[in-house]
A protein has these predicted regions:
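Secretory pathway targeting signatures of secreted, lumenal, and periplasmic proteins
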Residues: 6-61
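Surface-exposed amphipathic alpha-helical segments
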Residues: 7, 119-162
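Glycine-rich, often proline-containing surface loops adjacent to acidic residues and nearby aromatics
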Residues: 28-30, 87-90, 117-124
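A short, polar/proline- and glycine-enriched secondary-structure boundary/capping micro-motif
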Residues: 28-31, 42, 101-102, 132-136
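Coil residues (strongly favoring Ser/Thr
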Residues: 42, 54, 72-73, 114, ...
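Signature of long, low-cysteine stretches enriched in small and polar/charged residues
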Residues: 60-116, 131, 145
Length: 162
């Protein structure tokens, strides 16, 4: 996967990686995490948001106890799409921090790593109060399409991105 060099902060958790700019404005973030693939219902909105919320609660806590990132389920849409010739669930919506006034847009791609029988989720989200976020999230979203799972070949265009 290609991640912008501007994302200079890094955190590692259990089956979880976060890269971000860690700034108060125009904050851009990329996360990738995985969990066992057990059934097709993994690709429903309900399962996806439940799993996303549990992973983010552990790995992206708020400033105080009881604060954590969660999905605004009313403002989140999911759909299937084809990425690298394989099915992917795309989730596009809003996140917020429980018990705080933070939030913003996110885009996630969930795919099955058939070699390791795991669901791999790559996600981008931004926090940029009082500014338009469309261009920020679109720039970040492009990195989701550069993810190559085990057994997938990189395309020519992406071979030059290192």
């Amino acid at each position: 996967v290609w991640v912008s060099g501007e994302l200079s902060s890094f955190k590692e958790g259990e089956d979880f990686y976060w890269f971000g700019t860690n700034t108060a404005t125009r904050d851009r973030n990329f996360v990738i995490y995985s969990y066992p693939y057990t059934a097709y219902d993994t690709f429903t909105k309900e399962y996806f948001t439940h799993k996303r919320d549990s992973v983010m609660r552990v790995n992206i806590p708020g400033a105080r106890e009881g604060m954590y990132m969660e999905t605004d389920t009313l403002m989140t849409k999911v759909k299937g799409l084809n990425v690298q010739g394989q099915y992917a669930l795309e989730a596009r919506g809003l996140w917020r921090v429980k018990a705080d006034m933070m939030g913003g847009p996110f885009v996630s791609h969930a795919r099955v790593d058939t070699v390791n029988n795991r669901v791999v989720v790559a996600e981008v989200f931004v926090y940029s109060p009082d500014t338009r976020k469309r261009d920020l999230i679109r720039q970040m979203e492009a990195s989701l399409y550069t993810l190559r799972l085990p057994g997938e070949k990189a395309t020519q265009a992406n071979d030059s991105i290192k």
